[in-house]
Amino acid sequence: VGDLRALIFDFDGTIAETERSGHRVAYNRAFEALGLDDRWDEATYGELLAVAGGRERLEFYFAGAYPERSETERAELARSVHATKRRLFDDIGPTLHPRPGVVRLVEEATAGGVRVAIATTAAPEGVRAFFAGHPTLGRAFGVVVGGDDVPAKKPSPDIYVLALERLGVAASDALAIEDSAIGLRAARAAGLATLVTPSGYTLHEDFAGAAAICNDLENVDLAYCRALVA
């Protein structure tokens, strides 16, 4: 039996629908900036989201797109594209909007003495770029753990374990909020009850093991979150 002391949010797809019109656009602009002919349409990008982490996603894609290149060359290309993409996302991030109910739930949690954190495979620059457009929301998150902070990305539980450590909260006293099956697996492996709000790219994934599945956070309040960990 838990006593809700923290909400730990995933970022991409959970706090905001960043993938389709955010990260995907930035990747395509990076390809163009580096003189590459590659372009990711919405369907292709949706399939690539099965690979967690931007650089890892690029390496996976380049293995299929450029089989004639060595693994070292492909890894270098992935690093170059990823670095360029991260810079380009700085302009896109602030224009994206939080998903329904996110701001209200974060405000309610903060007012109710429940801490809020972020545990994401996203690069910290991407999170900062988004919050540059939503500074009040950004200030509410006292703990932000990213993929660069841990040895293994989701579905490994490392990110959630570190977030709990930094919060000083037991897994039984926290609720994870995720949008993907990969994220759900990571949170569950860390011992967290998990509320899933599927995003545009994850609607058809298998969310077995979730404490609850909601279209969004519009009708989710702190009392509902408390009940999920009780």
Positions of the model-derived regions?
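Short glycine-rich phosphate-binding loop at a beta-alpha junction
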Residues: 115-117
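N-terminal helical cap/lid subdomain that shapes the substrate entry/recognition surface
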Residues: 2-103, 107, 111-112
